[in-house]
Amino acid sequence: MSAEPQFDELIHPSTRLSIVALLAAADWVDFAFVRDSLGLSDSALSKQFATLEGAGYIGIERPLADRRRRVHVRLTDTGRSAFEGHVAALREIVASVDR
């Protein structure tokens, strides 16, 4: 990860940072997996997804599987770039304290 450091206020809140970090490690992730991994309610996760989707950071697909609606989420290129830049900015902050 060699992104230009850029602190991102949208990603920074702990819940969103956890969501984006989880999505960064995979291609498509099921809504239920994210919900269960982070211990969030459906409504809390949906609200965070709406914010991230509105910023263009995630993409959401709702394919029909076994007659049940599933929700799959992925990090977009914009979202991945923002996440990598945010992580780089956090590393710079931590490194400046260690000097």
Residue map of PLM features:
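Short, hydrophobic-biased segments on the C-terminal half of alpha helices
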Residues: 49-50
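Glycine-centered, phosphate/nucleic-acid-interacting loop/turn motifs that mediate DNA/RNA or nucleotide
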Residues: 56
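N-terminal helix-turn-helix DNA-binding core of bacterial DNA-binding proteins
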Residues: 2-44, 65-74
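Accessory beta->alpha helical hairpin/"wing" motif in late/C-terminal subdomains of nucleic-acid enzymes
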Residues: 75-79
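Amphipathic alpha-helical dimerization/coiled-coil segments
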Residues: 1-4, 18-21, 25, 81-99
